[in-house]
């Protein structure tokens, strides 16, 4: 994931910062506890495409 792109992108729901998960190929919003998928290097930032994070 391009570092500059990561600095520009924000959670579309809360407008908060996103964290890149290289293992899962997702962008994580820690505030909303949601993960946005990355397909073929393109972040899918649609709220309907998220998956909830499960706390362990």
From Swiss-Prot:
InterPro entries membership:
Trm112-like (IPR005651)
Superkingdom to which the source organism belongs: Bacteria
Gene3D superfamilies, per this entry? 2.20.25.10
Q: Which GO terms describe its cellular component?
A: cytosol
Cited Pfam families? Trm112p (PF03966)
Family to which this protein belongs:
Belongs to the UPF0434 family.
Cross-referenced HAMAP family: UPF0434
Q: What is the protein name stated in its UniProt record?
A: UPF0434 protein CBUD_1597.1
Source organism of this protein record: Coxiella burnetii (strain Dugway 5J108-111)
Tell me the lineage of the source organism. Answer: Bacteria, Pseudomonadati, Pseudomonadota, Gammaproteobacteria, Legionellales
């Amino acid at each position: 994931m391009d570092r500059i792109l990561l600095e520009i992108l924000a959670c579309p729901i809360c407008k908060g910062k996103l964290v890149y998960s290289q293992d899962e190929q997702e962008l994580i919003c820690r505030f909303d506890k949601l993960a946005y998928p990355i397909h073929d290097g393109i972040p899918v930032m649609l709220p309907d495409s998220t998956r909830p994070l499960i706390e362990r």
